[in-house]
Amino acid sequence: LEVVTLEDHSVPLVTIELAVRNGSFTEPPELNGLSHLYEHMFFKANRAIANAEQYLQKIGQLGIAYNATTREEVVHYYFTTTSPNLRTAMNFMRDASRHPLFDKGEFEPERQVVIGEIDRNESNPYYYLNLEMTNRLYYKYPSRKNPLGNRQTVSAATTDMMRLIQSRYYVPNNSALIVTGDVQFEEIFKMAQELFADWPRRDRDPF
């Protein structure tokens, strides 16, 4: 796991980001959009938190801002919080990245959310124009330039496919942990060692 940290003590805030070499460029056509769907499942139930409702409640109590983005070659997640909550946010990142449950009761509604996102984008003429241009420019593998995904593959997705993505890409030698803000270098590297040292390495998928 590559760990990057940047100190800035001007305000008592920290941001923790996990960047994973994943995204549409890593997907075969039959999995197009599943990196995006996986991103939507990241802030759900895991080993430490029973369900998404409890997850959001805990985050809200601590005033943690969070978000995620799926691009062609990277999926990244972040938490921003006050510096006293650093360890708690690091624990959240560890449990979400390493121990997701992929609860089927949470998976189906989230799959519908992603399908709705695809439908909304495809109803936009500018998105459709860009999609058609991509299909012609990258005619052999156009799906690799479409991180949003397509309706057919997302509709057919299962929790087993989420596990497949996790096993291929969510490994320490395919990820980077970036921590910035009101932190100390030594503290971050020590904490990363404590929380992520036993994360099993795997052979990276050759895409």
Label each region the model flagged.
Residues L18, H36-L37, I59, Y77, ...:
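Buried hydrophobic packing residues in well-ordered domains
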Residues L101-D119, Q184, D203-F207:
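Acidic/histidine-enriched alpha-helical segments
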Residues L1-E17:
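Mature N-terminal segment immediately following signal peptide/propeptide cleavage
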Residues N32, E53, Q57, R87, ...:
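Solvent-exposed, polar/charged alpha-helical surfaces in well-ordered, non-transmembrane soluble domains
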Residues G60, V113-E132:
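Short acidic/His-enriched helical or mixed secondary-structure segments at domain edges of catalytic enzymes
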Residues T15-T80, S123, R144-L148:
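M16/MPP (pitrilysin/insulinase) zinc-metallopeptidase core fold and M16-derived inactive scaffolds
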Residues K44-A48, T80-R111:
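M16/insulysin-pitrilysin zinc metalloprotease superfamily fold
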Residues Y139-K140, P147, V171-P172, A176-F207:
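An aromatic/glycine/proline-enriched structural segment found at the starts
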